[in-house]
Amino acid sequence: AAVAIQATLTLVEQMMSSIGGNGIMTIFEKATGKVYSLNMTGAAPKALDRESMTAETLNKGVRAGIVPGIFGGLISVLDRMGKLSLAEVFEPAIGYAENGYPIDPATVDYIQSQEEILRKHPTSVKAMFPKGRVPRAGEMFTWPDLASTLKKLVEAEQSALKSGKSRSEALQAAFDRFYKGDIAQEFDRFFKENDGFITAEDLEAYEPIWAEPVHTTFRGYDIFSSPSTSRGGLETLMQLNLVESYDLDAMGQNSAETLHLLAA
């Protein structure tokens, strides 16, 4: 379910979630009671040097990109924890991308705020401005190129299955098409043409990382998080430990005292 949701979010929450992005997953396995951490964050491109790391290049535009890790992570968790095929979990996302969904105001606002950057690239114009303008909230929004990419990944899996490969091998075939095949070459071409840094070599080197999560307790609850992120992770656990001794109920929800404590 998590993999299916993430694929669909690539379309319906594109400014925050994408198979071309990066992320962290903390997973509770009910059968064993174990908790796992999966780092789906790609590395910075090898070609990125200190002189290129400016406030402008690191925050927006083609040069801000790092190796996309989420798709590889989704394949890894689907293989290790899931039962369904990639074809099954990608089916909803492909359907929405082909047939459309009523685009929401938040996504429209985001596209509008990034219009100047998006219009620099014909592929972005084709995807984000299908009518030549910023979409209007409530309009049916399709993304045919996204559907095509998702279908290519499913095709790699299904072709492997038809040739007698195992489920794990078939999922690996989809992984390889993204990170080592024609999709990786398309990444390479785009970044070269637009003075970016990501190369096919960067993509080929990527692997998701499974790790032991960091852990603490908070008022009788076990709290787990990723050891490999600065947003959340150990920082959040430390914050919980720091406020545990305060009587937040007595201080009052959203009171000045409570907000001051949490902000500090």
Each model region followed by its residue ranges:
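Noncatalytic scaffold domains of N-terminal-nucleophile
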Residues: 2-173, 178-227, 231
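Internal alpha/beta scaffold segment
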Residues: 155-156, 214-216, 221-264
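Hydrophobic (often cysteine-bearing) scaffold residues that line and stabilize catalytic clefts
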Residues: 1, 70, 258, 262
